[in-house]
Swiss-Prot record:
Belongs to the CitD family. It comes from the Bacteria. Oligomer with a subunit composition of (alpha,beta,gamma)6. Keywords: Cytoplasm, Phosphoprotein. Its main location: cytoplasm. InterPro entries: CitD, Mal_deCO2ase/Cit_lyase_ACP. GO terms for cellular component: cytoplasm. This is Citrate lyase acyl carrier protein. The modification O-(phosphoribosyl dephospho-coenzyme A)serine is found at residue 14. Transmembrane segments: none annotated. Covalent carrier of the coenzyme of citrate lyase.
């Protein structure tokens, strides 16, 4: 999947996460979280895993975490990535 435009998913509310995805020449992940020292590596691993499953190898991903659960982070990354592409989504593969 190729990222062709800027897209955002999520909110900045407590227990949520806002994920911004935009075109970039390589994979760049920025994590802003009050719990980054404890969970930063896990957050990055989750983001990388979701992007890999979607076949994304080049994008800038900015994660503004407000204490979201892992399942919420996965959903937000998927949603932002799908909004940021012009490709037809294979929903059977995604779900």
């Amino acid at each position: 999947m190729k990222i062709t435009k800027v897209a955002v998913a999520g909110t900045l509310e407590s227990s949520d996460v806002q994920v911004r995805v935009q075109p970039f020449d390589s994979l760049d992940i920025e994590i802003n979280s009050s719990v980054a020292k404890q969970f930063g590596e896990q957050i990055e691993a989750t983001v990388r895993e979701v992007l890999a499953k979607l076949g994304i190898t080049a994008a800038q991903v900015i994660v503004e975490d407000k204490g979201a659960l892992d399942c919420v982070l996965q959903a937000r990354v998927k949603t932002a990535a799908m909004r940021a592409t012009d490709e037809t989504i294979n929903w059977e593969a995604v779900l």
